[in-house]
Amino acid sequence: FESHTNKFNLTYKNRSDEFHGLSIAGPKSRELLQKITRDDVSNSKLKFRDSRHMFIGGVPAIINRISFTGELGYEIYVAPHFQLKLYEEIMEAGKEFNIKPFGGRALMSMRLEKNWGAWTLDYRPDFTAKETGLDIFINWDKDFIGKENAQKDQGSNQLVPLIVQTNDI
């Protein structure tokens, strides 16, 4: 990124420590989310991989419609001092859906079941988009930094899942 910032007179800052995340997922997650926001979170207004700023449970948040679980789901990021309030709002609103908490290890297990790779765990900076299968997310009709190299990538290596069928576990 640094090699291109001067061309566009921009700066960037890592703000990871300014946000903490929660995830809601499952077939009723949209209904739950709609109960705690005034924004329209219908499929047509908040599509897969969309990101929005909105208030969730009265808390300013960044919401991403994406999930490692293999189900409909959302990642919600808030300032650390709002995380407990948001969690309590979600759990209260989710009672009618029989909501249950799940942790990071469960989430990581579910992402493996759906073959959804994670940066630094499964993917490294030296892997190409084609090798990881992430090239399906590239809009080749747009210009972007690295497009020329990405188009040249005709390598034969590709990460694939290994699925073992067993009846004795």
Residue ranges with predicted function:
Residues F1-I169:
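Conserved, structured C-terminal
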